[in-house]
Amino acid sequence: AEEAPQYADGLQAQMAQAQAMLEGLGYAKAGRMPVQLVHATQAMELDAELQRLTTGQQRLSTTVPAATFAVMAEKRSTLSMVIDHLLEHAPVLKTADAPEALALPKDGSPFGSVEVNKDSCTLCMSCVSACPANALQDNQAAPQLRFFEKNCVQCGLCVSTCPEKALNLVPRLLLTPQRKEVRVLNETQPYG
């Protein structure tokens, strides 16, 4: 029996994200699909498709050494280690004009940034309360809206919660070490 169509749509969106990352990092040529969905109803059919993929022209254009980390129970931690491994060996990052970030498809992006319109933001911190991943943070010592890009899952709760409509999502993969650092998005001087 065929699965619900929304499962296939979700898989296609995730595959588009993976393809964009692999192409952007220099592992795959545009138009070649190293990430493919295999449809099989029988074990023999699955085996034939896997054989076709491993012997065909769909492999990565660059060999990546095997990763040496163990898979974590928490999926986001494992994904973070996979990204770190791919970045460490990425062909595009070995060039003089290496990009700082890769734009990702908006649909289903697991990574990204948040832009703040500082003229509209009143630092009410509604977005901080709404953020399930602790990507948006306040500062107990000063009126600051801070952001930890590594944690952002692009869910959009911050955008929909903001009463000033001052936030926008930016689907991307930041390639610099700053993706693992907290940065200030907006701040004001405290009264006093």
Question: Where do the language-model regions lie?
Answer:
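Conserved SAM/SAH-binding loop-helix junction
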Residues: 157
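Accessory beta->alpha helical hairpin/"wing" motif in late/C-terminal subdomains of nucleic-acid enzymes
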Residues: 146-148
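Ferredoxin-type iron-sulfur electron-transfer modules and their immediate structural context
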Residues: 4-11, 23-140, 151, 160-192
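Histidine-anchored nucleotide/phosphate-binding helix
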Residues: 1
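Catalytic machinery of carbohydrate-active enzymes
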Residues: 20
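Short, surface-exposed alpha-helical segments at coil->helix boundaries
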Residues: 12-16
